[in-house]
Swiss-Prot record:
The gene is dnaJ. GO terms for molecular function: ATP binding; heat shock protein binding; unfolded protein binding; zinc ion binding. The J domain is necessary and sufficient to stimulate DnaK ATPase activity. Zinc center 1 plays an important role in the autonomous, DnaK-independent chaperone activity of DnaJ. Zinc center 2 is essential for interaction with DnaK and for DnaJ activity. Its cofactor is Zn(2+). NCBIfam families: DnaJ_bact (TIGR02349), PRK10767.1 (NF008035). InterPro entries: DnaJ (IPR012724), DnaJ_C (IPR002939), DnaJ_domain (IPR001623), DnaJ_domain_CS (IPR018253), HSP40/DnaJ_pept-bd (IPR008971), HSP_DnaJ_Cys-rich_dom (IPR001305), HSP_DnaJ_Cys-rich_dom_sf (IPR036410), J_dom_sf (IPR036869). The lineage of its organism: Bacteria, Pseudomonadati, Pseudomonadota, Alphaproteobacteria, Hyphomicrobiales. Zn(2+) 1 binds at residues 149, 152, 202, 205. This is Chaperone protein DnaJ. Zn(2+) 2 binds at residues 166, 169, 188, 191. Homodimer. It comes from Rhizobium etli (strain ATCC 51251 / DSM 11541 / JCM 21823 / NBRC 15573 / CFN 42).
Amino acid sequence: MAKADFYETLGVAKSADEKELKSAFRKLAMKYHPDKNPDDKEAERKFKEINEAYEMLKDPQKRAAYDRYGHAAFEHGGMGGGGGGFAGGGFSDIFEDIFGEMMGGGRGRQRSAGGRERGADLRYNMEITLEEAFSGKTAQIRVPTSITCDVCSGSGAKPGTQPKNCGTCQGTGRVRAAQGFFSIERTCPTCHGRGQIIPDPCPKCHGQGRVTEERSLSVNIPAGIEDGTRIRLQGEGEAGTRGGPAGDLYIFLSVKPHEFYQRDGADLYCAVPISMTTAALGGTFDVATLDGTKSRVSVPEGTQAGKQFRLKGKGMPVLRSAQTGDLYIQIQIETPQKLTKRQRELLQEFEQISSKENNPESTGFFARMKEFFEG
């Protein structure tokens, strides 16, 4: 029976990136996990296929070989004499070992003793408000991830049993094979470099040493955090295999755009429209700030559009500092609309009695323009 295409098994396109692969795998693994489907042979078969597909496609080298050669890349003897297939030596291991030894390099990628591997790092995207960035917060998040199996404590072996040293490589995880004029040391095809085999797999994790589960975590968001900041939670990523160290969880923060404020570092900017008469005659208005207080802004007579007023210390806190940015009020002057007859008459009268001193900028601008073009 022909093996299913790995991409079809995970339900992703061949162009899928690492994030899409991982997302598809988690979704399917949770759906077909044996714990959720007891005594369901079909679900167990699909679960194994999903694991196999993800294990191959998450490794860039294995994925490249599969994209080029298909399942033939992993069949026994696929190297024409090397034996063992891709997962047990294959293209990358042979090439890495040949060139590594010739160039004085090391052995290529290896697992530690007993097959222990560090768990994968995880990414979590979190969106917060500007108010939350101002005051800081403790957020509760739920992260689907692989955790150490509580039945076998990560060994992968059935309780009461132990993994055994691989008889093929004598527990080293590496074997030597003749390859033309070279003696090549490559990954053991029996234990896949772990150095151990599991005769009696754990019934819960099926020998993986890890299970997929959703965890609840508390994340401290410090006051003054900026958009695009990355927070690292050490050891909160996926559990390692066979007792290996866990990966890290990275929280990528984005701050929602605010209705009134724009942020530039620790400073805030707020555009405030005022009436034409307030700009001409002067006045005051109150501005609500992010610290929950109100600040009064005094507008002097003759204030022009674009004028900025600085409210010292009313901006954002500087991360891990006692300093605080400023709030800048940017004045916009609103031109009156839908005038009544009386309002129009008053404005026309005002225009008639106005002098150059009332509008020095516009008067001077047009005078300079006329002189420039007419000489």
